[in-house]
């Protein structure tokens, strides 16, 4: 039997890329590849790229320069290293990648990575292989299922892609061009995926998509299902105790999604709902198709049915034409909503998008100053949200052993990391702290450490608790 080949994947960007990287591992496992944590001993290196932020492609070319040196070093010891560029930069740049970086063997877009084995074989024969067209077939129908031991090794939380692409065409965004039009997976395929994950120890599922609440997959009744209806079905899967979804668009929040948050205990009271700006003129220039008031009404609808719900968001400062009054409207919106956290970025033009051709660019110094002011406000809100947990008892889903001996780490319903030292009084004879992995237990929060909650167990775990790896659950 041939020895296994080593695979190293460096993934950039969004949750979708994390999921895609895992599926690339699944695609290549039948070809004899196993993951390695470093480039040094890799036979194949894949850069799974993101094209959302400024200079994304230049970062890839810089990394390829470093990989050229690693490849030369491997060759000097008689070992061949193949290099592939996948993801959205691959989709956007295509042949330009191999022109600028001849070290690359394979270029593959995000809708075609199920063809990686064939592309690697083609590169062996022809020197390189490119595939950046949107394929006719649905890649999900060709992706192999991960092995049970692989699922267990990935932990108790898992991403499941339910939708890809976007039809919104925000003027700053490349996603419609790199990921294509909105496509939703069938309900039956998603249910099968979630059941398989639950059978192998997964307790928390995050449904992901570029515009996840635009989900409209075909259900077993041959009708299109909404995300809310899908969540209701998945909440009934045995073993799944927490459900999340990301990323959402305000315009696609419908009654069924609101009602799902009202009715489903498993659906976490934490929603990432990007707004980008609080200024109506800027929202119009971004082609967001909603106003700041529309966004506030959506927030109010969630809070009306689930008062404890919290939100995070995305913001862009310095969009072309943004005035101080526009920026003040963003600060006002953030103040009014009150976020548990948010991501803020300076505008950067993405080639091929309408905003890249807009005039009235905001000076870099002004963008820097606005970003700092916005981030200070967001940080203060996040700090206040976390401090409010001190003295409270919160439910924590434990995920893994901590870095410190005797420590266990999990997350709250709001994705706050929680660090606990259970101690012998909370553990049975012979039980290690990681025997709590996969359980939801009450934690009394005593203090904070940066963004993490520190506390103690407020109740003893069940006597039958055992590590998931031991049960094979």
Curated annotation (Swiss-Prot):
Q: How is the cofactor bound?
A: Binds 2 [4Fe-4S] clusters. One cluster is coordinated with 3 cysteines and an exchangeable S-adenosyl-L-methionine.
Could you say which EC number(s) this protein's record lists? 2.8.4.3
Report the residue ranges that make up the MTTase N-terminal domain in this protein: 5-125
Gene Ontology molecular function, alphabetical: 4 iron, 4 sulfur cluster binding; metal ion binding; N6-isopentenyladenosine methylthiotransferase activity
> Does Transcription count among this protein's keywords?
no
Domain called Radical SAM core: residue spans: 152-384
Q: Supply the alphabetized keyword list.
A: 4Fe-4S, Cytoplasm, Iron, Iron-sulfur, Metal-binding, S-adenosyl-L-methionine, Transferase, tRNA processing
TRAM domain: residues covered:
387-459
Reactions catalysed: N(6)-dimethylallyladenosine(37) in tRNA + (sulfur carrier)-SH + AH2 + 2 S-adenosyl-L-methionine = 2-methylsulfanyl-N(6)-dimethylallyladenosine(37) in tRNA + (sulfur carrier)-H + 5'-deoxyadenosine + L-methionine + A + S-adenosyl-L-homocysteine + 2 H(+)
Pfam families, A to Z: Radical_SAM, TRAM, UPF0004
Q: Which InterPro entries match?
A: Elp3/MiaA/NifB-like_rSAM (IPR006638), Methylthiotransferase (IPR005839), Methylthiotransferase_CS (IPR020612), Methylthiotransferase_N (IPR013848), Methylthiotransferase_N_sf (IPR038135), MiaB_methiolase (IPR006463), rSAM (IPR007197), rSAM_horseshoe (IPR023404)
Q: What does the record note on quaternary structure?
A: Monomer.
Family assignment? Belongs to the methylthiotransferase family. MiaB subfamily.
User: What does this chain do?
Assistant: Catalyzes the methylthiolation of N6-(dimethylallyl)adenosine (i(6)A), leading to the formation of 2-methylthio-N6-(dimethylallyl)adenosine (ms(2)i(6)A) at position 37 in tRNAs that read codons beginning with uridine.
**The name this protein goes by in its record:** tRNA-2-methylthio-N(6)-dimethylallyladenosine synthase
Protein source organism? Rhodopseudomonas palustris (strain BisB5)
Q: What is the gene name?
A: miaB
């Amino acid at each position: 039997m041939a020895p296994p080949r080593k695979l190293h994947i460096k993934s950039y960007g969004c949750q979708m890329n994390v999921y895609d990287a895992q599926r690339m591992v699944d695609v290549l496992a039948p070809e004899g590849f196993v993951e390695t944590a470093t480039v040094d001993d890799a036979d194949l290196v894949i850069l799974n790229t993101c094209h959302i932020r400024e200079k994304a492609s230049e970062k890839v070319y810089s990394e390829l320069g470093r990989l050229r040196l690693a490849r030369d070093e491997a060759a000097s010891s008689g070992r061949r290293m193949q290099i592939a560029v996948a993801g959205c930069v691959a989709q956007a740049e295509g042949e330009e990648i191999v022109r600028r970086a001849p070290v690359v063997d394979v270029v593959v877009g995000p809708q075609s990575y199920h063809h990686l084995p064939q592309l690697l074989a083609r590169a062996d024969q022809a020197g390189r292989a490119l595939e950046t067209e949107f394929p006719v077939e649905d890649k999900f129908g060709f992706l192999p299922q991960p092995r049970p031991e692989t699922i267990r090794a990935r932990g108790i939380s898992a991403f499941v892609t339910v939708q890809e692409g976007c039809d919104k065409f925000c003027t700053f965004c490349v996603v419609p061009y790199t990921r294509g039009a909105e496509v939703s997976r069938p309900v039956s395929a998603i249910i099968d995926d979630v059941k398989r994950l639950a059978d192998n120890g997964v307790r928390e599922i995050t449904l992901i998509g570029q515009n996840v609440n635009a989900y409209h997959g075909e259900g077993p009744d041959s009708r299109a299902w909404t995300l809310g209806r899908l969540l209701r079905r998945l909440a009934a899967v045995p073993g799944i105790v927490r459900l999340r979804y990301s990323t959402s668009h305000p315009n696609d929040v419908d009654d069924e999604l609101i009602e799902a948050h009202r009715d489903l205990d498993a659906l976490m009271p934490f929603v990432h709902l990007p707004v980008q700006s609080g200024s109506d003129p800027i929202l119009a220039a971004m082609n967001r198709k909603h106003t700041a008031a529309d966004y506030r009404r959506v927030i109010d609808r969630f809070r009306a049915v689930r008062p404890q719900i919290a939100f995070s968001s995305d913001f862009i400062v310095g969009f072309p034409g943004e005035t101080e009054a526009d920026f003040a409207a963003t600060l006002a919106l953030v103040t009014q909503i009150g976020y548990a956290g948010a991501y803020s970025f300076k505008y950067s033009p993405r080639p091929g998008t309408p905003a890249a051709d807009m005039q009235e660019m905001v000076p870099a110094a002004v963008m820097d100053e606005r970003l700092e002011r916005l981030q200070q406000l967001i940080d203060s809100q996040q700090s206040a949200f976390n401090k409010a947990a001190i003295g409270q008892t919160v439910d924590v889903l434990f995920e893994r052993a901590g870095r410190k001996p005797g420590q266990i780490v999990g997350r709250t319903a709001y994705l706050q990391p929680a660090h606990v030292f259970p101690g012998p009084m909370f553990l049975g004879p012979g039980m290690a702290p990681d025997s709590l992995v996969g359980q939801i237990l009450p934690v009394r929060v005593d203090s904070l450490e940066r963004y993490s909650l520190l506390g103690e167990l407020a109740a003893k775990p069940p006597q039958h608790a055992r590590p998931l790896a031991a049960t094979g659950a």
